[in-house]
Amino acid sequence: MGKYRKKAREIVFRTLYTYDIKGGDLFEIMEDHIKDIRGKLSKKTVDYIYSILKGIDEHLPEIDDILRENLKNWRLERLGYPERALLRLGVYELLFSDIEDKGRVFMDILDLTKCYIDNPDTVKFINGVLSTVYKNRQKVNQ
């Protein structure tokens, strides 16, 4: 059921990574990423990609502020491009999206981390930061 979301998250991750390196328009970058596979993507997947990117685009300064507040002994600007992209995606989906299955968000982000970075310490780092962000927000909302 949620495979379209996992594929969408991967495309959003790649879009955010490219955006961080080159700048530009998030939606143009995303369209460039999917131009060769668009016909193979379901409408649901493409709609979800647009939904996530729209939300990240609207909330990026706030997402970055949240990350800065929750990074221990790291500066956001010093993180690698893939780590920053994964954390931005994770924070958006955990705190700003209306998706109910937050556990699935964690699992997909960590799977992407393993796939694209393949460093156990980075997987722990991403998990730790996202867990801290999510727990801190839960405390505020209680």
UniProtKB/Swiss-Prot annotation:
Keywords: RNA-binding, Transcription, Transcription antitermination, Transcription regulation. The keyword S-adenosyl-L-methionine does not apply. InterPro entries: NusB-like_sf, NusB_fam, NusB_RsmB_TIM44. Pfam families: NusB (PF01029). It comes from the Bacteria. One of its GO terms (molecular function) is RNA binding. The keyword Thylakoid does not apply. GO terms for biological process: DNA-templated transcription termination; transcription antitermination. One of its GO terms (cellular component) is cytosol. PANTHER family: ANTITERMINATION NUSB DOMAIN-CONTAINING PROTEIN, N UTILIZATION SUBSTANCE PROTEIN B-RELATED. HAMAP family: NusB (MF_00073). Involved in transcription antitermination. Required for transcription of ribosomal RNA (rRNA) genes. Binds specifically to the boxA antiterminator sequence of the ribosomal RNA (rrn) operons. Belongs to the NusB family. This is Transcription antitermination protein NusB. It comes from Persephonella marina (strain DSM 14350 / EX-H1).
